[in-house]
Regions:
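Sec-dependent signal peptide recognition
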Residues: 1-7
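N-terminal signal peptide c-region/cleavage motif recognized by signal peptidases
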Residues: 14-15
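Active-site region of glycoside hydrolase catalytic domains
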Residues: 119-220, 225-258, 282-288
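Aromatic- and carboxylate-lined catalytic core of secreted/periplasmic carbohydrate-active enzymes
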Residues: 241, 312-336
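Compositionally biased, proline/threonine/alanine/serine-rich low-complexity intrinsically disordered stretches
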Residues: 325, 329-362
Length: 362
């Protein structure tokens, strides 16, 4: 009788454990992504050389919950080993890793051989990670642009084949696909989505990857006029309409305010950053800040002091609430563990680097 009671209790406990941990879906994954940052830990020689696992701890302490790991070169054994080191560091410190492939040759010349190269690149990466690291995401093509802007059929074909190949290896892997025109939200509707893919496929899009740069002789942001704010709001609304229509969720893979690592942020930059972050958070769209080297000195293992207030606004903005008068806002608390971690500068251990990429930051 006692054995029966124990067995029953174990079955109930097992059922409760399963009930407490629902299966990972794209919607829940998007919630977990929160605010992240684009990193060059696997793209540039300097980024590879300077990576220290404790940097991930510093990022988490600052409130960063995911990193977009940009990769430019072939998936050699050394590079795959380095990627695994990055992913393991992220898992250790509670940061979600997303690998993003630049696919430059394909973007410049979307011919059949280059299509195959992209697919094979991801097959190699997918095989290497197998079904491990369930929170690891794959961002298939970083900012589709150049000649690919004029070949939608090729882009959708590569996405279709790559998604199938990856899910033949790991059916649960979270995958991001981006539209043309450097991931413009207005082009989301051109993406060909596999049937019943809402639970594992997310869209990546973004605006202002390097801030509100001059376009056609005008800056899209000066003092934050009503027209400037409406233009940004409308682009975010375009993505929200696509989400509602398709049932898919999306992620802003990178936005910035312009060069900020050597200068004290201007009032205009702070206002722009606050508005962008608040609009995205109101829309419940996760996003990554572009980019790590603007805010973090990898060689010193410490945050750059000048742009730190700007980064804080981008991560945890103080937003007006509906019906509240502008300026009457509660201060948003910083990350709970922000003041506890010893900076990575205290660590002298550096990761061994594979043959690095000569790519420079975008």
């Amino acid at each position: 009788m006692l054995k029966l009671v124990i067995a029953t209790a174990l079955v109930i406990a097992s059922g409760l454990a399963c009930a407490a941990e629902p299966p990972l879906t794209a919607a829940r994954y998007a919630q977990e992504l929160g605010v992240g940052i684009d990193v060059d830990w696997a793209r540039t020689e300097r980024g590879i050389r300077e990576f220290d696992p404790l940097v991930v701890r510093d990022f988490h302490a600052k409130g960063i919950r995911h990193v977009r790991i940009r990769v430019a070169d072939e998936p050699t054994e050394a590079r795959l080993i380095h990627l695994r080191k990055l992913v393991e560091a992220c898992e250790q410190y509670g940061v979600i890793p997303v690998i993003a492939y630049q696919a430059d040759e394909y973007k410049n010349d979307p011919k059949a051989d280059n299509e195959k190269e992209v697919i094979n690149w991801w097959i190699a990466v997918a095989h290497y990670f197998g079904q491990r690291s369930p929170m690891l995401g794959f961002d298939l093509i970083y900012e589709p642009a150049d000649k690919l802007n004029h070949n939608l059929a090729s882009l959708n074909r590569v996405y279709e084949k790559t998604i199938k190949a990856i899910h033949d290896i790991d059916p649960q892997r979270m995958i991001f696909i981006a539209p043309r025109l450097r991931a413009a939200p207005e082009d989301l509707s051109s993406l060909k989505l596999p049937p019943r893919s809402q639970n594992y496929l997310l869209a990546e899009w973004h605006i202002f990857p390097w801030g509100p740069l001059k376009n056609n002789g005008k800056y899209p942001w000066t003092s934050g006029t009503a027209a400037e704010k409406a233009a940004i709001h409308n682009r975010i609304a375009t993505a929200l309409r696509w989400q509602q229509k398709t049932g898919h969720v999306s992620w802003v893979g990178g936005w910035g305010v312009g060069e900020s690592n050597r200068f004290t942020p201007t009032a205009s930059q702070m206002a722009f950053a606050t508005f962008m972050a608040c609009e995205l958070q109101k829309a419940k769209i996760p996003y990554a800040v572009n980019a790590d080297f603007q805010f973090y000195d990898g060689e010193e293992g410490a945050w750059r002091p000048a742009p730190e207030p700007l980064l804080q606004v981008m991560i945890a903005p103080v937003c007006d609430k509906p019906g509240e008068k502008p300026g009457h806002r509660a201060v948003k608390p910083a990350a709970r563990d922000a003041g506890r971690a010893t900076p990575a500068a205290a660590s002298t251990a550096k990761s061994a680097a594979p043959s690095g990429s000569s790519a420079s930051p975008d």
